[in-house]
Amino acid sequence: LYNMPSHVKVFLEPATVKTLANHSNIIGLKDSSANMTYFQTLLYHLGDNPDFSLYVGPEELTGECVLLGADGGVNGGANLCPELFASLYRALRDSDLEQVRRLQAEVLELGKLYRSRPGAAGVIRGLKYELSRRGLLKNVLAFPALPLRG
């Protein structure tokens, strides 16, 4: 399941997610709502289900969500700095809170590279621009979104 109300204008209610989590073909959810209260509610309702994984989208919340019980993050910034996010996850796994705070601060700084544009597609536009600037991909987006230009 994917909860991203800013893009699809539909919000997956926690009770609905809990019901769907019992379906054999549904194994997890990525939440990109950036709503910590919502994510905590999901953890409360689904934390006792070892067969259902919960992931967070916004990397600014990865540290907090994993500390609360999330299985991890699906973070766009990991495409730019994979070692930073791998180090963050290792620090979270090892409960090294001092290291988590330091790395999470780096994640926040990294986000400034690609979170400067408003709108629902702003992060995607910023990430694609930065990745193309580094020669990792072409700066092409699906219509109607337009790519950023340098």
Question: Model features per residue range: what roles?
Answer:
Residues 1-3, 141:
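Short beta-strands and strand-loop turn motifs
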Residues 7-111, 115:
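Catalytic alpha/beta core domains of metabolic enzymes, predominantly
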Residues 62, 66-71, 109-145:
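Conserved short secondary-structure transition element at the edge of the structured enzyme core
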Residues 147-150:
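Short, intrinsically disordered, charge-balanced linker/junction segments flanking boundaries
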